[in-house]
UniProtKB/Swiss-Prot annotation:
This is Solute carrier organic anion transporter family member 1A2. It comes from Homo sapiens. Glycans are attached at residues 124, 135, 412, 419. The lineage of its organism: Eukaryota, Metazoa, Chordata, Craniata, Vertebrata. The chain crosses the membrane at residues 21-40, 60-80, 87-111, 156-184, 204-224, 243-267, 312-333, 354-377, 382-405, 514-536, 546-571, 606-623. A conserved histidine residue in the third TMD (His-107) may play an essential role in the pH sensitivity of SLCO1A2/OATP1A2-mediated substrate transport. One of its GO terms (biological process) is monoatomic ion transport.
């Protein structure tokens, strides 16, 4: 008996360690996939400026990830469970690495980035011809011949980013459905929420790392190492600045490939957690069942697909949960993807600072919320109906708190000729002819070049020329323009490069907004695990993998793909001034109407999320009357344990009977 117990204990430890190894590996996979995703979302503004494309096209590039995911999600979700799940996940990680590498390629295939400017590097181009020169001619930085512009290769280099994002989406497909179903299959019923909470925590650590990496890369000039950064006349707060977006994609590619390695050494199946000590007792029974299943799969691997789809489609709670998810994903995809741009435009900070603050204030509370949510589910053994109520009412509380963000606003940047007159009076409608005034009408200034300067009167101007500046001192970012006839101040009128700061009040509003965002993130993350358990428990155990995959499919199709596109188009509609390329074509937007931008960024998600509570309340009503298939999961485990105990009792009876017989034989012989 001692050897048998030792062998069973060894087997238990080995199986337990393999499950823990899978948990560690899948958590790392969630870290790597969310690292890549958050980095991509954070670099949207940099990509927009690098390729001089509108926000709607950037939204399409961002949504292309979902297209790649859709190509495989149903196939992987259903057939993946019939194959070797850990190996499928490992292959997916490698493919994600390939996609990230493809996204970095344009940097190595195109020329150096050139931003629009009237100012030369030395500040002494043709005797300061970029300044106001009455009865003169503006000599701008050299432009290409129009015939050469049409042949410029970099105009379509964004296609590499598009294709790379599609490939990354294809690679990420197996991680969520196969990883979650693997945990559900082999973890204890009461441990499953905690394990999923830990995995989801990895999905928060990844974005935190991704945002920190993005913040660093956004602060490094795109062509660092190839140009002298001391000669730059723009800073990270300038809307023409482009960070080293390509560098982070290379790091993401390496991380994804390294994450794939452990999955190739993990088993496809494990004994149910908690029953490993009795593995030998039920070993033969499991082997017989597995042989029968293999035979069935060989001759009809697809026979259950349509019945499963029909069963899920006729499950009202499952379908309503998908509807809630689609509506809320439309809101959150937009908020997360364009939050750095919102912080830049609303509060006047750099892309690097916006990304950093977004990560520091939002992700730690979400991480803590996921862990606490999982612990609550485990500690108090929350039922599905209780979990649904917790998820719904916490989401409603966070939703009401969200409306306070409408109060934390800053005024538009006052740019003369766009939203402010030369007298400093705000104007609502931008008219191109309004950029000229008596003070600069004879300066022969270009009307479309975005090269802003900040006057010592607190107003910004499109360029030093339009500010009426006649002289300059200094070079690079330290250049100061003097004798500016359009700047109405007492004494010497002067201006410096860049837009004027929005002031200390705006910085205070930014802090309030970030604190509110952190509170909202924590409350909403508390509801995430209970809500996800409703999804898992409203399906039969054999339908879970397909159900999770179909849920992901629907959120991708109806939220992940269209949301960034229509949201980006709405943002483009608030643009006040577009950048100008060498040949006169429109580039990326340089400044938005921050008031309208705020109403779109905050108002549209508020409307979407508000409508999602209607199907959520219907779910609560249905749960009062329905008996969910997942509620039998624990009883299924208990049945197995009862069966095992029954077999153990049979073994004890046989052993006792044999002992009695041996005693009788011994007495007879004596």
């Amino acid at each position: 008996m001692g050897e048998t117990e030792k062998r069973i204990e060894t087997h238990r430890i080995r199986c337990l360690s393999k499950l823990k190894m899978f948990l560690l590996a899948i958590t790392c996979a969630f870290v790597s996939k969310t690292l890549s995703g958050s980095y991509m979302n954070s670099m949207l503004t940099q990509i927009e400026r690098q390729f001089n494309i509108p926000t709607s096209l950037v939204g399409f590039i961002n949504g292309s990830f979902e297209i790649g995911n859709l190509l495989l999600i149903i196939f992987v979700s259903y057939f993946g469970t019939k194959l070797h799940r850990p190996i499928m996940i490992g292959i997916g990680c490698v493919v994600m690495g390939l996609g990230c590498f493809l996204k970095s390629l344009p940097h190595f295939l195109m020329n150096q980035y050139e931003y629009e400017s009237t100012v030369s590097v030395s500040g002494n181009l043709s005797s300061n011809s970029f300044l106001c020169m009455e009865n003169g001619t503006q000599i701008l930085r050299p432009t290409q011949d129009p015939s050469e512009c049409t042949k410029e290769v970099k105009s379509l280099m964004w296609v590499y980013v598009l294709v790379g994002n599609i490939v990354r989406g294809m690679g990420e497909t197996p991680i969520l459905p196969l990883g979650i179903s693997y945990i559900e299959d082999f973890a204890k019923f009461e441990n499953s929420p905690l394990y999923i909470g830990l995995v989801e925590t990895g999905a928060i650590i990844g974005p935190l790392i991704g945002l920190l990496l993005a913040s660093f890369c956004a602060n490094v000039y795109v062509d660092t190492g190839f140009v002298n950064t001391d000669d730059l006349i723009i800073t990270p707060t300038d809307t023409r600045w482009v960070g080293a977006w390509w560098f982070g994609f290379l790091i993401c590619a390496g991380v994804n490939v390294l994450t794939a390695i452990p999955f190739f050494f993990l088993p496809n199946t494990l004994p149910k957690e908690g029953l490993e000590t009795n593995a030998d007792i039920i070993k033969n029974e499991n082997e017989d069942k597995q042989k029968e299943e293999v035979k069935k799969e060989k001759y009809g691997i697809t026979k259950d697909f349509l019945p499963f789809m029909k069963s899920l489609s006729c499950n009202p709670i499952y379908m309503l949960f998908i509807l809630v998810s689609v509506i809320q994903f439309n809101a959150f995809v937009n908020m997360i993807s364009f939050m750095p741009k919102y912080l830049e435009q609303q509060y006047g900070i750099s892309s690097s600072d916006a990304i950093f603050l977004m990560g520091i204030y939002n992700l730690p509370p979400i991480c803590i919320g996921y862990i606490i949510g999982g612990l609550i589910m485990k500690k108090f053994k929350i039922t599905v109906k209780q979990a649904a109520h917790i998820g719904c009412w916490l989401s409603l509380l966070e939703y009401l708190l969200y409306f306070l963000s409408f109060l934390m606003t800053c005024e538009n940047s006052s740019v003369v000729g766009i939203n402010t007159s030369y007298e400093g009076i705000p104007q609502d409608l931008y008219v191109e002819n309004d950029i000229f005034a008596d003070c600069n009408v004879d300066c022969n200034c270009p009307s479309k070049i975005w090269d802003p300067v900040c006057g010592n009167n607190g107003l910004s101007y499109l360029s030093a020329c339009l500010a009426g500046c006649e002289t300059s001192i200094g070079t690079g970012i330290n250049m100061v323009f003097q004798n500016c006839s359009c700047i109405q101040t007492s004494g010497n009128s002067s201006a410096v490069l860049g837009l004027c700061d929005k002031g200390p009040d705006c910085s205070l509003m930014l802090q309030y907004f970030l604190i509110l965002s952190a509170m909202s993130s924590f409350i909403y993350s508390l509801a995430a695990i209970p809500g996800y358990m409703v999804l898992l428990r409203c399906m039969k155990s054999e339908e879970k993998s397909l159900g999770v995959g179909l849920h992901t499919f629907c959120t991708r199709v109806f939220a992940g793909i269209p949301a960034p596109i229509y949201f980006g188009a709405l943002m483009d509609s608030t643009c006040l001034h577009w950048g100008t390329l060498k040949c006169g074509e429109s580039g990326a937007c340089r400044i938005y109407d921050s008031t309208t931008f705020r109403y779109i960024y905050l108002g549209l998600p508020a409307a979407l999320r508000g409508s999602s509570f209607v199907p959520a309340l219907i779910i609560l009503i249905l749960l009062r009357k329905c008996h969910l298939p997942g509620e039998n999961a624990s009883s299924g485990t208990e049945l197995i344990e009862t069966k095992v105990k029954g077999k153990e009792n049979e073994c004890k009876d046989i052993y006792q009977k044999s002992t009695v017989l041996k005693d009788d034989e011994l007495k007879t012989k004596l």
